[in-house]
Swiss-Prot record:
The modification Phosphoserine is found at residue 371. N-glycosylated. It is a multi-pass membrane protein. Residues 1-96, 154-159, 225-239, 351-406, 468-473 are extracellular. The chain crosses the membrane at residues 97-117, 133-153, 160-180, 204-224, 240-260, 330-350, 407-427, 447-467. This is Serine incorporator 3. One of its GO terms (biological process) is plasma membrane phospholipid scrambling.
Amino acid sequence: MGAVLGVFSLASWVPCLCSGASCLLCSCCPNSKNSTVTRLIYAFILLLSTVVSYIMQRKEMETYLKKIPGFCEGGFKIHEADINADKDCDVLVGYKAVYRISFAMAIFFFVFSLLMFKVKTSKDLRAAVHNGFWFFKIAALIGIMVGSFYIPGGYFSSVWFVVGMIGAALFILIQLVLLVDFAHSWNESWVNRMEEGNPRLWYAALLSFTSAFYILSIICVGLLYTYYTKPDGCTENKFFISINLILCVVASIISIHPKIQEHQPRSGLLQSSLITLYTMYLTWSAMSNEPDRSCNPNLMSFITRITAPTLAPGNSTAVVPTPTPPSKSGSLLDSDNFIGLFVFVLCLLYSSIRTSTNSQVDKLTLSGSDSVILGDTTTSGASDEEDGQPRRAVDNEKEGVQYSYSLFHLMLCLASLYIMMTLTSWYSPDAKFQSMTSKWPAVWVKISSSWVCLLLYVWTLVAPLVLTSRDFS
Protein backbone atom coordinates (compact mmCIF):
# COMPACT_ATOMS: atom_id res chain seq x y z
CA MET A 1 0.00 0.00 0.00
CA GLY A 2 2.82 2.36 0.88
CA ALA A 3 4.49 1.62 -2.44
CA VAL A 4 1.29 2.45 -4.31
CA LEU A 5 0.97 5.74 -2.47
CA GLY A 6 4.61 6.44 -3.25
CA VAL A 7 3.97 5.86 -6.96
CA PHE A 8 1.02 8.26 -6.92
CA SER A 9 3.11 10.81 -5.00
CA LEU A 10 5.85 10.51 -7.61
CA ALA A 11 3.30 10.78 -10.41
CA SER A 12 2.12 14.09 -9.00
CA TRP A 13 5.58 15.50 -9.83
CA VAL A 14 5.43 14.47 -13.50
CA PRO A 15 3.71 17.70 -14.62
CA CYS A 16 6.47 19.64 -12.88
CA LEU A 17 9.17 17.61 -14.60
CA CYS A 18 7.62 18.46 -17.94
CA SER A 19 6.94 22.14 -17.17
CA GLY A 20 8.87 25.10 -15.81
CA ALA A 21 11.52 25.19 -13.14
CA SER A 22 9.29 27.28 -10.92
CA CYS A 23 7.10 24.24 -10.22
CA LEU A 24 9.96 22.04 -9.04
CA LEU A 25 11.09 24.20 -6.13
CA CYS A 26 7.90 26.13 -5.43
CA SER A 27 7.28 24.40 -2.11
CA CYS A 28 10.77 25.30 -0.87
CA CYS A 29 11.04 28.83 -2.23
CA PRO A 30 7.59 30.05 -3.36
CA ASN A 31 8.65 33.71 -3.53
CA SER A 32 11.82 33.14 -5.52
CA LYS A 33 12.40 34.29 -9.07
CA ASN A 34 12.25 31.97 -12.04
CA SER A 35 15.70 33.01 -13.24
CA THR A 36 17.26 31.98 -9.92
CA VAL A 37 15.37 28.69 -9.58
CA THR A 38 16.36 27.55 -13.07
CA ARG A 39 20.04 28.17 -12.44
CA LEU A 40 19.88 26.36 -9.11
CA ILE A 41 18.39 23.29 -10.80
CA TYR A 42 21.11 23.24 -13.44
CA ALA A 43 23.70 23.68 -10.69
CA PHE A 44 22.16 20.74 -8.80
CA ILE A 45 22.36 18.58 -11.94
CA LEU A 46 26.04 19.42 -12.31
CA LEU A 47 26.73 18.72 -8.63
CA LEU A 48 24.87 15.41 -8.88
CA SER A 49 27.02 14.42 -11.85
CA THR A 50 30.09 15.32 -9.78
CA VAL A 51 28.95 12.91 -7.07
CA VAL A 52 28.39 10.20 -9.68
CA SER A 53 31.87 10.82 -11.10
CA TYR A 54 33.38 10.47 -7.64
CA ILE A 55 31.47 7.22 -7.05
CA MET A 56 32.83 5.88 -10.34
CA GLN A 57 36.34 6.13 -8.89
CA ARG A 58 35.50 3.85 -6.00
CA LYS A 59 36.97 0.34 -6.04
CA GLU A 60 33.53 -1.21 -5.70
CA MET A 61 32.62 0.03 -9.18
CA GLU A 62 35.30 -2.08 -10.90
CA THR A 63 33.05 -5.13 -11.05
CA TYR A 64 30.34 -3.23 -12.87
CA LEU A 65 32.62 -1.26 -15.17
CA LYS A 66 34.44 -4.42 -16.28
CA LYS A 67 31.14 -5.66 -17.72
CA ILE A 68 31.24 -2.89 -20.32
CA PRO A 69 32.82 -4.43 -23.46
CA GLY A 70 36.44 -3.33 -23.82
CA PHE A 71 36.27 -0.84 -20.97
CA CYS A 72 38.42 -2.76 -18.48
CA GLU A 73 40.07 -5.93 -19.64
CA GLY A 74 41.39 -8.32 -17.03
CA GLY A 75 41.89 -5.95 -14.13
CA PHE A 76 45.35 -5.01 -15.41
CA LYS A 77 47.95 -3.39 -13.19
CA ILE A 78 49.86 -0.32 -14.22
CA HIS A 79 52.92 1.30 -12.71
CA GLU A 80 52.71 5.04 -12.08
CA ALA A 81 56.12 6.69 -12.27
CA ASP A 82 55.49 9.76 -10.16
CA ILE A 83 54.42 7.99 -6.99
CA ASN A 84 56.06 4.57 -7.40
CA ALA A 85 52.92 2.62 -6.66
CA ASP A 86 50.91 0.00 -8.54
CA LYS A 87 47.40 0.95 -9.53
CA ASP A 88 44.70 -1.63 -10.02
CA CYS A 89 42.16 -1.49 -12.80
CA ASP A 90 39.64 0.12 -10.44
CA VAL A 91 41.52 3.41 -10.22
CA LEU A 92 42.37 3.68 -13.90
CA VAL A 93 38.90 2.68 -14.99
CA GLY A 94 37.57 5.20 -12.49
CA TYR A 95 39.53 7.86 -14.36
CA LYS A 96 38.14 6.62 -17.68
CA ALA A 97 34.60 6.72 -16.24
CA VAL A 98 35.11 10.29 -15.03
CA TYR A 99 36.29 11.26 -18.53
CA ARG A 100 33.13 9.75 -20.05
CA ILE A 101 30.72 11.39 -17.62
CA SER A 102 32.41 14.76 -17.98
CA PHE A 103 32.31 14.36 -21.76
CA ALA A 104 28.55 13.81 -21.61
CA MET A 105 28.01 16.81 -19.33
CA ALA A 106 30.18 19.06 -21.47
CA ILE A 107 28.38 18.05 -24.68
CA PHE A 108 24.97 18.52 -23.02
CA PHE A 109 25.69 22.04 -21.81
CA PHE A 110 27.56 23.02 -24.98
CA VAL A 111 24.56 22.08 -27.13
CA PHE A 112 22.30 24.13 -24.87
CA SER A 113 24.74 27.02 -25.09
CA LEU A 114 24.30 27.00 -28.87
CA LEU A 115 20.53 26.57 -28.68
CA MET A 116 20.07 29.46 -26.24
CA PHE A 117 22.13 31.96 -28.20
CA LYS A 118 20.48 35.41 -28.36
CA VAL A 119 17.48 34.57 -26.14
CA LYS A 120 16.21 37.98 -25.00
CA THR A 121 13.04 37.29 -22.97
CA SER A 122 11.16 34.39 -21.41
CA LYS A 123 8.57 34.77 -24.19
CA ASP A 124 11.01 33.15 -26.59
CA LEU A 125 10.09 29.50 -27.28
CA ARG A 126 13.66 28.48 -26.52
CA ALA A 127 13.31 30.00 -23.05
CA ALA A 128 10.57 27.45 -22.35
CA VAL A 129 13.05 24.68 -23.15
CA HIS A 130 15.66 26.31 -20.92
CA ASN A 131 13.27 26.75 -17.98
CA GLY A 132 11.24 23.57 -18.40
CA PHE A 133 10.96 20.07 -19.89
CA TRP A 134 13.20 18.74 -17.14
CA PHE A 135 12.16 15.10 -17.58
CA PHE A 136 13.22 15.08 -21.22
CA LYS A 137 16.43 16.99 -20.58
CA ILE A 138 17.49 14.66 -17.77
CA ALA A 139 16.59 11.63 -19.89
CA ALA A 140 18.68 13.01 -22.76
CA LEU A 141 21.61 13.63 -20.42
CA ILE A 142 21.45 10.08 -19.06
CA GLY A 143 21.33 8.77 -22.62
CA ILE A 144 24.45 10.74 -23.56
CA MET A 145 26.23 9.44 -20.46
CA VAL A 146 25.38 5.82 -21.24
CA GLY A 147 26.45 6.23 -24.85
CA SER A 148 29.74 7.85 -23.87
CA PHE A 149 30.85 4.66 -22.10
CA TYR A 150 30.84 2.88 -25.46
CA ILE A 151 33.18 5.38 -27.13
CA PRO A 152 36.21 3.42 -28.40
CA GLY A 153 39.40 4.00 -26.44
CA GLY A 154 42.15 4.88 -28.88
CA TYR A 155 43.28 8.45 -28.42
CA PHE A 156 40.06 9.62 -26.77
CA SER A 157 41.57 9.95 -23.29
CA SER A 158 44.65 11.86 -24.44
CA VAL A 159 42.69 14.22 -26.69
CA TRP A 160 40.00 14.80 -24.08
CA PHE A 161 42.71 15.52 -21.50
CA VAL A 162 43.95 18.42 -23.65
CA VAL A 163 40.39 19.68 -24.15
CA GLY A 164 39.75 19.31 -20.43
CA MET A 165 42.88 21.21 -19.46
CA ILE A 166 41.98 24.13 -21.74
CA GLY A 167 38.37 24.17 -20.52
CA ALA A 168 39.42 23.91 -16.88
CA ALA A 169 41.82 26.83 -17.32
CA LEU A 170 39.02 28.94 -18.79
CA PHE A 171 36.72 27.99 -15.90
CA ILE A 172 39.40 29.02 -13.40
CA LEU A 173 39.29 32.45 -15.03
CA ILE A 174 35.51 32.49 -14.60
CA GLN A 175 36.00 31.63 -10.93
CA LEU A 176 38.37 34.58 -10.68
CA VAL A 177 35.75 36.91 -12.16
CA LEU A 178 33.15 35.62 -9.70
CA LEU A 179 35.62 35.99 -6.83
CA VAL A 180 36.38 39.60 -7.71
CA ASP A 181 32.66 40.27 -8.11
CA PHE A 182 31.96 38.71 -4.71
CA ALA A 183 34.77 40.66 -3.03
CA HIS A 184 33.53 44.00 -4.39
CA SER A 185 29.90 43.23 -3.53
CA TRP A 186 30.82 42.09 -0.02
CA ASN A 187 32.88 45.19 0.68
CA GLU A 188 30.22 47.55 -0.71
CA SER A 189 27.48 45.86 1.32
CA TRP A 190 29.36 46.19 4.60
CA VAL A 191 30.49 49.75 3.89
CA ASN A 192 26.86 50.69 3.23
CA ARG A 193 25.81 49.18 6.55
CA MET A 194 28.66 50.95 8.29
CA GLU A 195 27.44 54.27 6.88
CA GLU A 196 23.81 53.59 7.78
CA GLY A 197 24.38 52.88 11.45
CA ASN A 198 26.55 51.23 14.13
CA PRO A 199 29.81 52.02 12.30
CA ARG A 200 32.05 50.56 15.00
CA LEU A 201 30.53 47.08 14.67
CA TRP A 202 30.85 46.92 10.90
CA TYR A 203 34.30 48.50 10.94
CA ALA A 204 35.42 45.84 13.42
CA ALA A 205 33.92 43.13 11.20
CA LEU A 206 35.74 44.46 8.13
CA LEU A 207 39.00 44.73 10.04
CA SER A 208 38.63 41.22 11.49
CA PHE A 209 38.03 39.49 8.15
CA THR A 210 40.73 41.51 6.41
CA SER A 211 43.27 40.65 9.11
CA ALA A 212 42.25 36.99 9.12
CA PHE A 213 42.70 36.68 5.35
CA TYR A 214 46.12 38.32 5.43
CA ILE A 215 47.26 36.20 8.40
CA LEU A 216 46.18 33.01 6.61
CA SER A 217 48.01 34.18 3.50
CA ILE A 218 51.22 34.79 5.45
CA ILE A 219 50.93 31.35 7.04
CA CYS A 220 50.48 29.83 3.58
CA VAL A 221 53.59 31.59 2.30
CA GLY A 222 55.61 30.29 5.24
CA LEU A 223 54.39 26.71 4.75
CA LEU A 224 55.06 26.81 1.02
CA TYR A 225 58.61 28.07 1.51
CA THR A 226 59.20 25.44 4.20
CA TYR A 227 57.83 22.33 2.50
CA TYR A 228 57.86 23.08 -1.24
CA THR A 229 61.39 24.46 -1.55
CA LYS A 230 64.89 23.20 -0.78
CA PRO A 231 68.12 25.18 -0.37
CA ASP A 232 69.71 23.46 -3.37
CA GLY A 233 66.69 22.88 -5.59
CA CYS A 234 63.02 23.51 -6.39
CA THR A 235 63.92 26.72 -8.24
CA GLU A 236 60.54 26.90 -9.98
CA ASN A 237 58.69 26.75 -6.67
CA LYS A 238 60.82 29.52 -5.21
CA PHE A 239 60.02 31.66 -8.23
CA PHE A 240 56.28 30.93 -8.06
CA ILE A 241 55.99 31.76 -4.37
CA SER A 242 58.18 34.87 -4.54
CA ILE A 243 56.60 36.44 -7.61
CA ASN A 244 53.06 35.86 -6.34
CA LEU A 245 53.96 37.29 -2.95
CA ILE A 246 55.36 40.42 -4.61
CA LEU A 247 52.33 40.77 -6.90
CA CYS A 248 49.94 40.44 -3.95
CA VAL A 249 51.77 43.17 -2.03
CA VAL A 250 51.67 45.44 -5.09
CA ALA A 251 47.94 44.81 -5.59
CA SER A 252 47.24 45.59 -1.94
CA ILE A 253 49.17 48.87 -2.14
CA ILE A 254 47.34 49.86 -5.33
CA SER A 255 43.96 49.22 -3.69
CA ILE A 256 44.58 51.92 -1.05
CA HIS A 257 46.42 54.40 -3.28
CA PRO A 258 44.92 57.92 -3.01
CA LYS A 259 44.23 58.09 -6.76
CA ILE A 260 42.34 54.80 -6.64
CA GLN A 261 40.43 55.87 -3.53
CA GLU A 262 39.47 59.10 -5.25
CA HIS A 263 37.75 57.29 -8.10
CA GLN A 264 36.67 54.24 -6.08
CA PRO A 265 36.17 55.19 -2.43
CA ARG A 266 35.00 51.69 -1.54
CA SER A 267 37.98 49.81 -2.84
CA GLY A 268 40.07 48.56 0.04
CA LEU A 269 42.03 45.86 1.73
CA LEU A 270 39.12 43.44 2.23
CA GLN A 271 39.07 42.65 -1.47
CA SER A 272 42.87 42.58 -1.63
CA SER A 273 43.13 40.19 1.31
CA LEU A 274 40.62 37.77 -0.23
CA ILE A 275 42.38 37.88 -3.60
CA THR A 276 45.72 37.35 -1.86
CA LEU A 277 44.46 34.28 -0.02
CA TYR A 278 43.01 32.80 -3.20
CA THR A 279 46.27 33.49 -5.05
CA MET A 280 48.19 31.58 -2.39
CA TYR A 281 45.76 28.68 -2.81
CA LEU A 282 46.33 28.68 -6.58
CA THR A 283 50.09 28.74 -5.99
CA TRP A 284 49.86 25.70 -3.72
CA SER A 285 47.51 23.95 -6.13
CA ALA A 286 49.93 24.51 -9.01
CA MET A 287 52.92 23.17 -7.10
CA SER A 288 50.85 20.15 -6.01
CA ASN A 289 50.89 19.03 -9.66
CA GLU A 290 54.66 19.31 -10.05
CA PRO A 291 56.15 16.02 -11.37
CA ASP A 292 59.22 16.23 -9.11
CA ARG A 293 58.02 14.51 -5.94
CA SER A 294 60.94 15.85 -3.89
CA CYS A 295 59.53 19.36 -4.44
CA ASN A 296 55.93 18.24 -4.09
CA PRO A 297 55.18 16.59 -0.75
CA ASN A 298 51.60 15.65 -0.10
CA LEU A 299 49.55 17.07 2.76
CA MET A 300 50.07 13.99 4.92
CA SER A 301 53.79 14.74 4.78
CA PHE A 302 53.02 18.15 6.28
CA ILE A 303 51.18 16.54 9.16
CA THR A 304 53.93 13.94 9.63
CA ARG A 305 56.66 16.57 9.78
CA ILE A 306 54.73 18.81 12.13
CA THR A 307 53.41 16.18 14.55
CA ALA A 308 56.10 13.50 14.43
CA PRO A 309 59.55 14.00 15.99
CA THR A 310 62.17 14.99 13.44
CA LEU A 311 64.77 12.69 14.93
CA ALA A 312 64.46 8.95 15.19
CA PRO A 313 64.59 7.69 18.79
CA GLY A 314 68.00 6.59 19.94
CA ASN A 315 70.01 8.20 17.17
CA SER A 316 70.40 11.45 15.30
CA THR A 317 69.14 10.26 11.93
CA ALA A 318 66.36 12.39 10.58
CA VAL A 319 63.12 10.71 9.70
CA VAL A 320 62.36 11.47 6.08
CA PRO A 321 58.66 11.21 5.32
CA THR A 322 57.83 9.55 2.04
CA PRO A 323 54.93 10.42 -0.17
CA THR A 324 51.84 8.45 0.73
CA PRO A 325 50.68 6.25 -2.12
CA PRO A 326 47.04 6.41 -3.00
CA SER A 327 44.70 4.09 -1.23
CA LYS A 328 43.42 1.21 -3.28
CA SER A 329 40.13 1.31 -1.43
CA GLY A 330 38.97 4.31 -3.34
CA SER A 331 39.81 7.27 -5.47
CA LEU A 332 42.81 9.54 -5.33
CA LEU A 333 40.92 12.65 -4.25
CA ASP A 334 43.43 14.51 -2.09
CA SER A 335 43.24 17.68 -0.02
CA ASP A 336 44.04 19.94 -2.96
CA ASN A 337 41.16 18.46 -4.92
CA PHE A 338 38.77 18.76 -1.99
CA ILE A 339 39.57 22.45 -1.60
CA GLY A 340 39.23 22.93 -5.34
CA LEU A 341 35.80 21.30 -5.30
CA PHE A 342 34.76 23.40 -2.30
CA VAL A 343 35.71 26.62 -4.09
CA PHE A 344 33.95 25.32 -7.20
CA VAL A 345 30.71 24.69 -5.30
CA LEU A 346 30.78 28.17 -3.75
CA CYS A 347 31.37 29.82 -7.13
CA LEU A 348 28.68 27.71 -8.78
CA LEU A 349 26.09 28.63 -6.16
CA TYR A 350 27.12 32.28 -6.26
CA SER A 351 26.80 32.34 -10.05
CA SER A 352 23.33 30.81 -9.69
CA ILE A 353 21.96 33.44 -7.31
CA ARG A 354 23.79 36.56 -8.51
CA THR A 355 22.06 38.96 -10.88
CA SER A 356 23.31 41.65 -13.21
CA THR A 357 21.74 44.26 -10.97
CA ASN A 358 24.22 43.71 -8.15
CA SER A 359 27.28 42.74 -10.13
CA GLN A 360 30.23 45.00 -9.46
CA VAL A 361 32.42 43.35 -12.07
CA ASP A 362 29.89 44.28 -14.76
CA LYS A 363 30.59 47.91 -13.90
CA LEU A 364 34.34 47.45 -13.80
CA THR A 365 34.71 45.47 -17.03
CA LEU A 366 33.54 46.12 -20.54
CA SER A 367 30.27 44.20 -20.11
CA GLY A 368 28.38 46.71 -18.06
CA SER A 369 26.42 48.20 -20.96
CA ASP A 370 25.02 44.79 -21.82
CA SER A 371 23.64 44.10 -18.36
CA VAL A 372 19.91 43.99 -17.94
CA ILE A 373 18.75 45.93 -14.89
CA LEU A 374 15.17 45.21 -13.91
CA GLY A 375 13.16 46.16 -10.91
CA ASP A 376 11.79 43.51 -8.57
CA THR A 377 8.49 42.06 -9.67
CA THR A 378 6.80 40.31 -6.81
CA THR A 379 3.14 40.82 -7.56
CA SER A 380 2.75 38.51 -10.53
CA GLY A 381 2.96 35.37 -8.43
CA ALA A 382 -0.08 36.08 -6.31
CA SER A 383 -2.57 34.69 -8.81
CA ASP A 384 -0.78 31.36 -8.94
CA GLU A 385 -2.02 30.48 -5.47
CA GLU A 386 -5.66 30.92 -6.42
CA ASP A 387 -8.02 28.08 -7.36
CA GLY A 388 -5.71 25.51 -5.75
CA GLN A 389 -3.05 25.90 -8.44
CA PRO A 390 0.55 25.12 -7.41
CA ARG A 391 2.60 28.11 -6.39
CA ARG A 392 5.24 29.05 -8.88
CA ALA A 393 8.22 31.33 -8.75
CA VAL A 394 7.89 34.78 -10.23
CA ASP A 395 8.68 35.06 -13.93
CA ASN A 396 10.92 38.11 -13.84
CA GLU A 397 12.18 37.76 -17.40
CA LYS A 398 9.14 38.71 -19.48
CA GLU A 399 10.69 42.05 -20.41
CA GLY A 400 14.28 40.85 -20.55
CA VAL A 401 16.46 38.01 -19.29
CA GLN A 402 18.37 38.50 -16.05
CA TYR A 403 21.43 36.67 -17.39
CA SER A 404 22.70 35.25 -20.66
CA TYR A 405 21.31 31.73 -21.07
CA SER A 406 23.99 30.87 -23.61
CA LEU A 407 26.90 32.05 -21.47
CA PHE A 408 25.47 30.31 -18.40
CA HIS A 409 25.42 26.96 -20.21
CA LEU A 410 28.90 27.62 -21.59
CA MET A 411 30.09 28.22 -18.03
CA LEU A 412 28.57 24.88 -16.95
CA CYS A 413 30.25 23.20 -19.92
CA LEU A 414 33.63 24.52 -18.78
CA ALA A 415 32.76 23.61 -15.18
CA SER A 416 32.24 20.00 -16.29
CA LEU A 417 35.76 19.96 -17.70
CA TYR A 418 37.12 21.54 -14.51
CA ILE A 419 35.44 18.80 -12.47
CA MET A 420 37.02 16.17 -14.71
CA MET A 421 40.50 17.60 -14.23
CA THR A 422 40.04 18.04 -10.49
CA LEU A 423 38.75 14.53 -9.83
CA THR A 424 41.62 13.05 -11.87
CA SER A 425 44.19 15.29 -10.14
CA TRP A 426 45.16 16.83 -13.51
CA TYR A 427 47.02 13.60 -14.31
CA SER A 428 47.83 13.04 -17.97
CA PRO A 429 47.06 9.66 -19.60
CA ASP A 430 48.98 8.24 -22.51
CA ALA A 431 47.25 7.10 -25.68
CA LYS A 432 46.67 3.55 -24.42
CA PHE A 433 45.78 4.69 -20.91
CA GLN A 434 48.64 2.67 -19.46
CA SER A 435 50.06 5.39 -17.22
CA MET A 436 48.82 8.43 -15.30
CA THR A 437 51.37 11.09 -14.44
CA SER A 438 51.58 14.69 -13.32
CA LYS A 439 52.80 17.00 -16.06
CA TRP A 440 54.21 20.53 -16.17
CA PRO A 441 51.41 21.93 -18.39
CA ALA A 442 48.98 21.52 -15.49
CA VAL A 443 51.39 23.44 -13.25
CA TRP A 444 51.70 26.32 -15.70
CA VAL A 445 47.95 26.49 -16.30
CA LYS A 446 47.28 26.94 -12.60
CA ILE A 447 50.12 29.34 -11.89
CA SER A 448 49.20 31.43 -14.93
CA SER A 449 45.63 31.63 -13.66
CA SER A 450 46.93 33.11 -10.40
CA TRP A 451 48.67 35.86 -12.36
CA VAL A 452 45.53 36.52 -14.39
CA CYS A 453 43.59 36.72 -11.12
CA LEU A 454 45.83 39.49 -9.84
CA LEU A 455 45.82 41.31 -13.19
CA LEU A 456 42.04 41.15 -13.31
CA TYR A 457 41.74 42.56 -9.81
CA VAL A 458 44.21 45.35 -10.54
CA TRP A 459 42.27 46.16 -13.70
CA THR A 460 39.06 46.60 -11.70
CA LEU A 461 40.96 49.13 -9.59
CA VAL A 462 42.59 51.16 -12.35
CA ALA A 463 39.76 50.93 -14.91
CA PRO A 464 38.13 54.22 -13.79
CA LEU A 465 41.47 55.97 -14.28
CA VAL A 466 41.99 54.52 -17.76
CA LEU A 467 38.43 54.62 -19.11
CA THR A 468 37.58 58.15 -18.06
CA SER A 469 34.56 58.36 -20.38
CA ARG A 470 32.88 55.36 -18.76
CA ASP A 471 30.49 55.65 -15.80
CA PHE A 472 31.62 53.47 -12.88
CA SER A 473 29.37 55.03 -10.26
